[in-house]
C-alpha cells in the first residue's frame, strides 16, 4: 500500500496518525503436521517525484537566456509506475521486481557516467580553444597598442554584457539535466568562437537524440570581458542526490552506485605518460653514437656470452661468423683469436685474459736493491743415515733430539734457529738420511743457502752421501764437508777426502775450494770452527732480503694436529709474516691465527730466514708448496680454487682413447696383481716418502695401489674405504680415533702400525710376496732317448729308454719332446729293468718306463726328467 491509494468514503475519515506499517499473520505448515503463525509487517513506500515534474509548464522560461543555447539533452525517462501493493505481490514477483529495479538503476548510472565523460571532454576542448583565442587576442592587442592608443574604448559593451549575464543565468530550466551540459558554461568572449562551438556539436554522438526543443531567438554574439569568462559555472547537481531521491534504495543499487565512475588504472596512467614522453622526444630523436666497450675475453668463450659482454645481439655475431665461414650457434665455444676478430669488427676494444692470470706468479717480482737488508743464512745438514747429522745439530743447539726419535733415525725434516756467541743467527734444516726420504732432501737442498755434508770418518761415503752430493750440485749451493765421529779410533779423515775426489769435490786441504772440518758431536771438538766457516761462507754470499713487504715462504713440513688442526712448518724467504695475514699455500687458503717458533713460543711476526709453525690454514698443504700473502680472502679463495681445478684436471687427465689402448690396459690389469693400501702418516713428508718407497717395491707381477694417503689420525672414512676394498690400513706414527677403533673391531679390518719406515717397507714387501704364492723351481735330473715302443696291457704303451744323462727316478715329472717340440707333460708311473721294478736308473743303462696319462710315444722321442721345488717368493 502507498500514500497515493485514494478509496472513496461516504464521510470524513477520523483524525489520526497514519501508520506506515500494516501488520498481518501468515500460517506456516511443516512436516509431521506442525504449523506456525508468523506476524508479517508490510511497510508503505513513500513516492517522491523528480524536481520539475510537478511544473511541466515551466519549460518555456528557458527562452529568456540571451545567449544561443545548444540543443538540450533528452529528459530523463519518466519514473516507473509504482509497484503493486505488497499485499498483492508474491515472493517471486517481488524478487523479479527488485532485480529489474537494480538493473535499471545500474543502466541509469552507466548512462549518467557516459554523459559526464562526454561533458568533460567537450568542456576540455572548449577551454583549450578559449585559451588559444585569448592568447592570440592578447598578442594582437599587444602588437596594435602602439599604433592605436584610443583602442581601449572598444570593449565598453563588456560591462553591460556582464550585467545581463547574471540576470539570464538563474532562469529556471524545465529539464534538470540541462544544467549539467557543457553549454551551461559562460558564452565565449569572441564572436568567432560561436561557429567553432557549432562545429564541435556533432562530435558527441554518444548523447541520445533530444525529445523536445526549446525555441530560443538567435541573439547577437555578446563580447564578454575576461572576468565574465572566468566566472565559475553554475554548480552542477550531484548525481548521487538525484539517485537518493529517485525511489527505493536497494542493496544492489547501493553496491553498484559508483560503478559508472570507475577511476583509471595505474597501468593506463603509465601508458599515457609513456606515450606523452615518446611524443615529446619524437622530434628530438637523433641517431646515437655507438658506445665503444672494453670487452674482457678469456681463452674460450661462448658466442652468447661474448654478445652479452659486447652488448650486441647474438644473432649479429652468428651472422658475422657465417660470413667468416664458421657455422656456429650461440651456445658454441670459440677461441680467443676468433673472439678478437668479432670484437674488432663490431668496433670494441678487447682485453685478453687467461685462466692462469688468476694464479700468483712472484718470480718476476724483484725487490729494489735499496730495500734489501742482511738476513741469517739457511744451512741444511745432509748425509747418510746414522752418520751423526742430528747429533751434530744437537751439539750445536745444546739439545737432545736423537733420544726422542724412533729407531734412532730422523724421519722428519726439522727447522731450527740458533744464536751464536757473537750474536749472529743461523737457521738449520735437518733432513732424513734414509733412502726413502729423497724428496725431503731435494726440498732441503732447494731452499738452503749452504749445505753441510756429513760423512762419518769411520764409515766412508755411502749411497745417500753420494745422493746428497748430487742434490747439492743440482741446487747450485756451496758445500761444507763435516767429517764426524772424530773421537773414535777408527777415524780416517784422509781416506774420506780421497773418496770425495771421485765425485769432483776437492777440499781446501787438497788445494780445492770446498771447506772441510773434523768434528765430534760427543766431545764438541770442531763445532766452533764449523760455525766460523758457516758465517764466513754466508758473508761471501752476501745474503739479503726485503723484510718490508708481503711475506713469501716455503713449506718445509706439514701435518694435521688433533688439537690445533692443520699445521705447516714454513721458512720465510722474504718479507715479514704476521699474525692475521691472509695467505694462500698450494691448493689451500686461510689466515694466520698463530705462529710458533722452534722452541714452541708464540711469535707475532716472522722475518726472513726464520722457520715458524703456522696455524690457521684451511687444509694440510703439500710439503714444498709456496706460501704467499694476498690482500683479501676473496683473492685467496680464487687462487686456491684455480689451483685445485688444475690439480684435479691433471690427476684425471687420460690419454686419447683407442681400442688398442683399451685392450692393452685390460690385459695389463688382468696380468698384474694389485695390492691395495690405505696410508695415514703424522706429517706430509712422511706420507710422501712412504708412497714413493712402496711404489719402488712394485714388480711386473704385483704392484701397490694406494687408495688413499693423508695426514692425521685414522678416521671412520678410512676404515669404510679399507673395508669396501679389502685393503689393510697402514698407520705411521698415528692411531685411530675412538669411532674408527670401534669400526675396526666390528668390521675386522686389518691394521698395521709402524714408527720406522724401513720396517714398514719390509712388512709390505713380504705381504705382497705372499699374495703371489710360492714359486715352482724346476731342476732337470736326467735325460733319455726312446728306442722302442711296445704294448703294456690292453691300452697302455711302454717305452724302452736309453738313459743319456743323469738319472731317472720313479714318480718324477717328465716332458716328452719330439723334434724339440713338447708333446706332453707327464709323470713316470712305472720304472723297470729286466722285468724288475727299480727306483732309479743311471746314465748309460737301458730301462722300460710307463708314462701316466699318455700313449703318444714314438721311437726317437726325447724324455726329460725334472724335480719341482716350491719356494716362497721374494720381491
UniProtKB/Swiss-Prot annotation:
Binding site for GTP: 383-390, 430-434, 484-487
Region named G2: 408-412
Keyword field contains Transferase: no
Region (G3): 430-433
Region called Disordered, residue ranges: 1-20, 47-102, 126-246
Compositionally skewed regions (Basic and acidic residues) per UniProt: 88-102, 126-140, 223-246
Region feature G5, mapped onto this chain: 520-522
Name assigned to this protein: Translation initiation factor IF-2
Taxonomic lineage from the root: Bacteria, Pseudomonadati, Pseudomonadota, Alphaproteobacteria, Sphingomonadales
Gene transcribed to yield this protein: infB
